[in-house]
Amino acid sequence: TAFSIDPWLITTEFHKCGRVNFGEKQGLECVAMGVEKVLHKIRAHYAKYGIAHEPYVYVKSDSGTYGMGIMTVKSGDEMLEINKKIRNKMNVIKEGVQSTEVIIQEGVPTVDVVDAAPAEPMLYLVDGHAVGGAYRVNDQRDAENNLNATGMRFVGMCDESEADATHKALPPCQFGALG
């Protein structure tokens, strides 16, 4: 029996912009329009599913971020109004590589919490099988920001059999071990 599922439930909306130079303020109009385009799509999904959360997007380099050159925005106007400090941060990523193309990606609020801090799960797969994992945790960030930043740490991931039923937060365990 076949079934159908809205692809948005398992993927995110995104848009790409090329020929961007944050230092020279070139291409920011494309980024701003892309932000609005993605936000419009997200708002439609939120209305369809009754989600009462303000949508946001990540604007990030398309050449890998290493946790650098990422910003969270809630409107295209924010892109047109960014100050020089933020433009410089977005213009150059790790090892001085200039960011000339960006991805505008739907933001998904972090729902996992470890030690009262937002956390995102990371699973390690070998041959399609989960063999380990950890949570990226950052108590200096909120549920809408990139957790791969200063203050980030990893906490081992356990399966339910290792959890103490009375413990509300995720349990400490051996880093990376599952099952």
Regions found by a protein language model. Give the residues of each.
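Conserved N-proximal alpha/beta basic substrate-recognition cap immediately N-terminal to
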Residues: 1-53
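Proline-rich intrinsically disordered, low-complexity coils
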Residues: 7, 18, 55, 118-121, ...
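Conserved catalytic alpha/beta cores of large enzymes that bind or transform nucleotide phosphates
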Residues: 150-179
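Generic detector of intrinsically disordered, low-complexity, polar/charged segments
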Residues: 15, 20, 24, 61-66, ...
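A structural signal for short, well-ordered beta-strand segments and their strand-loop junctions
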Residues: 4-11, 58, 72, 103
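Phosphate-binding site of ATP-dependent enzymes
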Residues: 37-56, 63-68, 74-157
